[in-house]
Amino acid sequence: LPSQHLCGSHLVEALYFVCGPKGFYYLPKAXXFVDSLAGYSKHQNGGISGIVEHCCHNTCSLFDLEGYCN
């Protein structure tokens, strides 16, 4: 599937689809490490703003969503 804008309930449904029984959280695992290497943290304010910025304001793929699974 191509990258797409996912917002609101569509984003939550996509996360349930991709993550299944593992569940999910809103801050990707690699973000803190990658951002610390870059010398800043985009997700300083935490949680949900990261995935909304990534997948709703911009586009993300199913592969991107996997980064938010537990």
From Swiss-Prot:
Any single biological process term in GO: glucose metabolic process
Localization (cell): Secreted
Cysteines engaged in disulfide bonds, as pairs: 7-56, 19-69, 55-60
Propeptide residues according to the Swiss-Prot or TrEMBL record: 33-49
Any one cellular-component term (Gene Ontology): extracellular space
Matches recorded under InterPro entries: Insulin, Insulin-like, Insulin-like_sf, Insulin_CS, Insulin_family
Domain of life: Eukaryota
Alphabetical keyword list: Carbohydrate metabolism, Disulfide bond, Glucose metabolism, Hormone, Secreted
GO molecular function: hormone activity
Signal peptide: none
Subunit-structure text: Heterodimer of a B chain and an A chain linked by two disulfide bonds.
PANTHER family to which the protein is assigned, alphabetical: INSULIN, INSULIN/INSULIN GROWTH FACTOR
Function in brief: Insulin decreases blood glucose concentration. It increases cell permeability to monosaccharides, amino acids and fatty acids. It accelerates glycolysis, the pentose phosphate cycle, and glycogen synthesis in liver.
Similarity section: Belongs to the insulin family.
Protein name per UniProt: Insulin
Upper lineage: Eukaryota, Metazoa, Chordata, Craniata, Vertebrata
